[in-house]
């Protein structure tokens, strides 16, 4: 099976994104436009191509992609124009389907797959999924094992079913299940419990040396924070000339370099103890992932 994400924002027809999304929810479908003039509904690919291939000079690549790759039981993330997230379980693969309502309202959604769709609270959406919505491409795979297993677990949880078998064995360690942003958030929360207040404006993508800066309300000291995951190394020597002390966290202890003068390593066991003591109030996505690996 595969995990995908799709933007519902048709450019043709009425090009009303809100109306198109509401239509998809009501009909239990997700998809794209590339409509034919005859609007002949069909599940036979060759019939669709015979007409659409002429209209669009063969440039129907996204429809071909959906036809080839989307199958029953795949999972698809989507997002409405107001920023709400949804997770969909595919019921059946590609078909050309334009309802009477779509024709009357000129809703440019016709190359579709039927699915069951559940709204997901933003607190339950993994950072990897959110990041995948930044590119403008309409439809793409989310090729991430953690996101796949979490999405299966989340579907089972929200639908109150056991539809998917979740591979817990590959993620027995919570830090293998958390993505980069979730691990940063965890350290963010830990430091605040230790009396360090994070400076929100310092949390920028172009801050190369630090993930964010923190300040002590009692002493006024400012410190940097760096977090890496997986097999990515943290080089302590990069901070030898830093004007700040720097907190470092790498859950797999991938530290290199000899500088110890102004770096403070947050030990893995310290973070595990923090998780255990704080799991009742940690972000729900982290709570879900703790349940997933239990």
Feature-to-residue mapping (PLM):
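Mixed-charge (Asp/Glu-Lys/Arg
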Residues: 1-72, 77-294
């Amino acid at each position: 099976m595969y995990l995908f994400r799709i933007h519902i924002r048709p450019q043709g027809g009425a090009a009303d994104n809100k109306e198109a999304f509401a239509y998809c929810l009501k009909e239990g479908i997700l998809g794209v436009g590339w409509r034919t003039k005859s609007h002949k509904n069909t599940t036979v690919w060759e019939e669709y191509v015979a007409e659409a291939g002429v209209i669009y000079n063969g440039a129907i690549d996204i429809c071909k992609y959906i036809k080839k790759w989307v199958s029953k039981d795949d999972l698809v993330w989507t997002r409405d124009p107001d920023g709400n997230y949804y997770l969909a379980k595919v019921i059946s693969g590609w078909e050309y389907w334009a309802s009477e309502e779509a024709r009357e309202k000129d809703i440019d959604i016709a190359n579709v797959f039927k699915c069951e769709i559940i709204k997901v609270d933003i607190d339950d959406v993994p950072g990897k999924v959110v990041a995948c919505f930044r590119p403008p491409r309409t439809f793409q795979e989310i090729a991430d094992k953690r996101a796949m297993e979490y999405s299966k677990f989340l579907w089972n949880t929200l639908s109150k079913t056991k539809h998917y078998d979740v591979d817990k064995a590959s993620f027995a360690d919570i830090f293998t299940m958390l993505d980069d942003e979730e691990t940063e958030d965890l350290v963010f929360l830990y430091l605040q419990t230790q009396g360090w207040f994070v400076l929100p404006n310092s949390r920028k993508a172009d801050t190369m040396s630090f993930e964010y800066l923190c300040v002590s309300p009692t002493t006024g000291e400012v410190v940097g924070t760096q977090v890496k995951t997986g097999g990515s190394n943290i080089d302590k020597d990069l901070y030898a000339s830093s004007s700040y002390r720097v907190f470092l966290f790498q859950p797999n202890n991938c530290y290199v370099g000899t500088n110890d003068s102004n770096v403070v390593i947050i030990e893995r066991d310290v973070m595990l103890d923090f998780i255990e003591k704080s799991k009742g109030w940690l972000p729900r996505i982290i709570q879900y992932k703790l349940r997933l690996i239990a």
